[in-house]
């Protein structure tokens, strides 16, 4: 379970990283080369696509931060974890759940995000 917790925290760190070069390095370290991301509002594939959609989300939600909500859960090569998006004032704005598959190299091969109603 320690690896599940580490992956979830690294994943959210990538979403919170505002420096483009540092974010890109996190994406490359965290995701497989052909990884896929999908949620109700956006989709991306590969390091370029995932980095671009994270950057777009940051522009759409300036000053917001993601935090892990609860303990991640994992079995076999599947990981799930909840998160909360907090506004600049610290108030919870949105909650969601992501389900990820982990590739043979230990990096994320796919992430499917589910958005709950506004927090």
Question: Where does each model-flagged region fall?
Answer:
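A beta-strand edge to alpha-helix "cap/lid" segment located at domain peripheries
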Residues: 16, 58-119
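A generic alpha-helix structural signal
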Residues: 8, 12, 51-54, 82
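A solvent-exposed, acidic/Ser-Thr-rich amphipathic alpha-helical stretch
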Residues: 22-77
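Short acidic-aromatic low-complexity motifs
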Residues: 1-30
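Aromatic side chains
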Residues: 11, 31, 37, 81-83, ...
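A general structural-boundary detector
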Residues: 14, 37-40, 87
């Amino acid at each position: 379970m320690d690896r599940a917790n580490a992956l979830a925290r690294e994943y959210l760190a990538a979403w919170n990283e505002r420096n483009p070069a540092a974010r890109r390095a996190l994406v490359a370290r965290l995701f497989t080369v052909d990884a896929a991301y999908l949620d109700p509002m956006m989709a991306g594939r590969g390091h370029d696509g995932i980095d671009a959609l994270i950057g777009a989300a940051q522009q759409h939600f300036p000053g917001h931060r993601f935090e892990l909500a609860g303990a991640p859960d994992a079995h076999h090569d599947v990981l799930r974890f909840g998160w909360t998006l907090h506004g600049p004032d610290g108030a919870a704005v949105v909650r969601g759940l992501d389900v990820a598959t982990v590739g043979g190299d230990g990096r994320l091969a796919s992430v499917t995000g589910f958005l709950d109603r506004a927090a």
